[in-house]
Amino acid sequence: MKPIGPLMWEHRLIEKMLSFFEAATRKINEKNKVDPLFIDTAVDFIRTYADRTHHGKEEDILFRDLIKKQLSQEHARIMEELVEEHKYARNKVGMLVDAKERYLKGGNTSQEIVVLLNELARFYPIHIEKEDKHFFYPCMDYFTKEEQARMLQEFFEFDRNMIHEKYRTVVDRIEAQSV
């Protein structure tokens, strides 16, 4: 299996999660009420799965190794765009958290939340298509079969460590709140 296999599987789960955003925005528009639990769950999914786990493998492993190669101008440009797009998504998620917090304090941010959910739901499919159809496959040509096998193993190790990282952070946050 090529190392892009797990990345593309992760894309399918991200797309599935995003498919729930439309129903969430419809409910907000119908009831003029935000479900903070849905927002928290969506944010946790995007931050932990889409960003830290998925984008982490891309940036910390795939892109790190690609930088060492003689990339074509097109592939170098696309990789730079992808990094900027990851930053864009992080920013939008931060804005979503901020809007939800203001909502919980009585702010009228329901439409801001709708806009942010819609922006994320529009952004990710385009970003995913760019990776799946224009970047991942051609980039594998820069690596030998042995390099690809090592990268795949590094992806698996990265995933194994993620659960520990996530819950270490949870415990640290609870500890900080209890002091």
Tell me what each language-model feature is:
Residues M1-V179:
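Small-residue-biased structural context
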